[in-house]
Amino acid sequence: MSDMHSLLIAAILGVVEGLTEFLPVSSTGHMIIVGHLLGFEGDTAKTFEVVIQLGSILAVVVMFWRRLFGLIGIHFGRPLQREGESKGRLTLIHILLGMIPAVVLGLVFHDTIKSLFNPINVMYALVVGGLLLIAAECLKPKEPRAPGLDDMTYRQAFMIGCFQCLALWPGFSRSGATISGGMLMGVSRYAASEFSFLLAVPMMMGATVLDLYKSWSFLTAADIPMFAVGFVTAFVVALIAIKTFLQLIKRISFIPFAIYRFVVAAAVYVVFF
């Protein structure tokens, strides 16, 4: 593979990762399809995907750095208030409660989960995840009990964490599972999305660093330019995608995302079967 060809592949996959990682459309499904079409598969490809995920995570840190510092008691300027005055405040406990279910389940069933990484399981997950998005839009309370992040209860955070367990099924979409769960628990669409992004930082950082440690041997000095291009591209695109997504969901529901998931599932079927 020539240098220019590998850098082009890195840029394409960086765009795909950045666009889809935090949208409820399954980055796994997209990466499987695009990686297959580009002929970029195998151990090096898996390590590359881990590295560019770090770029996407960094975008969330940059977007929500004030809120993240606030979770550990460090505040800059006036206290954050999203939608009117709130009696409470989002704390580190909310994040920990949102993490516990998936962390426990992920550790217990780690090997089983890894065995699910194949096109057929991803295809089914895309469909089921799309149905959950539709269910969340149809069944959510008319008036959210938690219009803003600081209105969320510990129970809501824990229940969102339980929904996050669905994302252990490859192709389901972590953001799709957590946002849908939040809406069903009475959290507004916007606040549920913000909480999903905040929850992604420790969850994805931990999983990504662990995967990177295990696959470090597949990274060579010759791969560094390619990995750097993918990392930076994923970071920039994810930053734009998150900002756009948060503005978009103020005006539209998640139904279009659900329909898109069904289209991607059909694409997986066509490409692999």
UniProtKB/Swiss-Prot annotation:
Any Pfam family: BacA
Gene that this polypeptide is encoded by: uppP
Alphabetical keyword list: Antibiotic resistance, Cell inner membrane, Cell membrane, Cell shape, Cell wall biogenesis/degradation, Hydrolase, Membrane, Peptidoglycan synthesis, Transmembrane, Transmembrane helix
GO cellular component: plasma membrane
Miscellaneous: Bacitracin is thought to be involved in the inhibition of peptidoglycan synthesis by sequestering undecaprenyl diphosphate, thereby reducing the pool of lipid carrier available.
Protein name (database record): Undecaprenyl-diphosphatase
Protein family per UniProt: Belongs to the UppP family.
EC number: 3.6.1.27
Keyword Nucleus attributed: no
Functional description taken from the UniProt entry: Catalyzes the dephosphorylation of undecaprenyl diphosphate (UPP). Confers resistance to bacitracin.
Gene Ontology annotations of biological process type: cell wall organization; peptidoglycan biosynthetic process; peptidoglycan metabolic process; regulation of cell shape; response to antibiotic
